[in-house]
Amino acid sequence: QLVFQVSTKRSVDVVGVASNPWGDVRRIDTPSPVYDHAEPVEIGHVVFFTDRLDAMEVFYASLGFITSDRYPGRGVFMRCAPDAGHHDIFLLALPNKGPGLNHVAFTVRDIHEVFGGGLHMSRQGWKTQLGPGRHPISSAYFWYFENPCGGLIEYNADEDHLTPAWQERCFEPGPTMFAEWAIDGGID
């Protein structure tokens, strides 16, 4: 029997690593980390295929999810709270594709851990589907792997953080909207 239970997210004691964007140097006399594997902090988001996009959006909105962005008639990015990461769930309607799991994303600390985790997965024999790369809609860095359960898994980091002031955006689907840049089949 499947049972759902309301719970709250537990705090995780993870120290992020400062970066040095142009004009805002924060990491001084300290090199960026090199990770030999990833240690995910949380499940960042889940993506489901649906053939009932409008009904699914209404369902998740009734649970309190807020729409962040959308591909009209094709996909909806939704978050659990007004002040949160870009999306916790993405509902994706593709022609001739019924309901199912597309992927589960695991959040890691930074882009360096995306690379370290991705290279580790490759060394363990897991096949890269796409990555590393960057999603322009959420600004997140990613690396996707095939999953023996079906669907994909993703390491991701550096997702946009939204507030109640965020205005939903609409995008036309296309390869550059999915990935600003990406390596097909990985760098392994």
What name fits each language-model region?
Residues 45, 85-87, 103, 134-136:
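Histidine-centered active-site/metal-ligand motif
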Residues 48-86:
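Core segments of cupin and vicinal oxygen chelate
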Residues 27-31, 35-58, 65:
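Non-heme Fe(II) oxygenase catalytic core, chiefly the N-lobe of the double-stranded beta-helix
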Residues 1-39, 42-50, 76-77, 96-188:
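Vicinal oxygen chelate
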Residues 27, 56, 86-87, 108, ...:
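Catalytic cores of nucleotide-enabled group-transfer and carboxylate-activating enzymes in metabolic
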Residues 84-101:
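Flexible internal linker/loop segments at domain or repeat junctions
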